[in-house]
Amino acid sequence: VIIVDSVPDSAMLPLSTPPDSVCLLRLSAIGDTCHVVPLLRSLQRAWPQTRFSWVIGKAEARLMTLLPEIEFITVDKRAGLRGLRELRRTLGDRRFDLLLHLQLSIRASAVAAVIRARCKLGFDRARARELQWLFTDARIEPKTREHVLDSFMGFAAACGVEDRRLVWDLPLPEPARERARGLIPEDRGRAARTMVISACSSHALRNWRAERYAAVARHAIERHGMRVILAGGPARIEREMAEAIRRDCPSAIDQVGQDTLPELLALLQRATVLLAPDTGPAHMATMVGTPVIGLYAATNPARSGPYLSRQWCIDAFPRAAAAFLNSTPERLPWATKIERPGVMDLISVGEVCTRLDELLALPP
């Protein structure tokens, strides 16, 4: 069921025949683009002859261009009107059969306005924040309190696609695999047990303390004989975090700022587990089947946690809701963030170590 405005071509949904061309619009961030991939794979299975294009941010494209047979059209999100003019020149007089508008921001909607399509499908009115509904002429079925990935799969349902299995399947370049094998060598015929720590989120108030990461790293090394690798980007906050962790745990291997996104993905695929807050690498690990111990207090893992590892997440969001907002998650708007100083201190070293012990106790 979808709600359609009175625009003639929007009546094409759900589709009775495959479209010739589909454009997906999701500019950022890394984690959200990871959530788009199962939607794209579902559409590809249903419509093998359809041409797919993806309008995406430049940083995110460095990872997603691993997907074959997709045209990537990059947009410089910082370029403003100049970026929109460049996109208009790139697209020329092209007109897609269908645009999937997957981003709730006025900046993304400005991009959607530049893209010509017979039908522009967006979120239902209740979820279409920042006036997204003004830039679409069809809506997905209204749902409440969904994980972000599930909300994206609602676009496949609106198009009449029934096979919505979760498949990512990003081919990894052999040089990236080889680099990962160098960092995580073989041990008795399989990759050595390794915990990767991606310690920083895009928002500093979602980050755990360096000394707590170091304590868990020491536990992994001393109790389980694991290798510990610190991973992340080259930003100053990530470098400072890595240096602080290594002061308390010198055995941790510092890879922060040294990997491309495909190399990081290959490293995560070879790892035993990832420890991370609400950050893009948590969803990258999910794409390659690596379990994630997610640290969630500022955000709700039911909405934005690693999709296949929510049982391994430390969910301190209810504690945060009580401590900072005198409320419960059920009473708060679904997209609420509790990015307050000290919120991540609600997560203890002991509960993270216990979760790691439980995960490692499972048969390989």
What positions do the PLM features span?
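Catalytic machinery of carbohydrate-active enzymes
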Residues: V1-P364
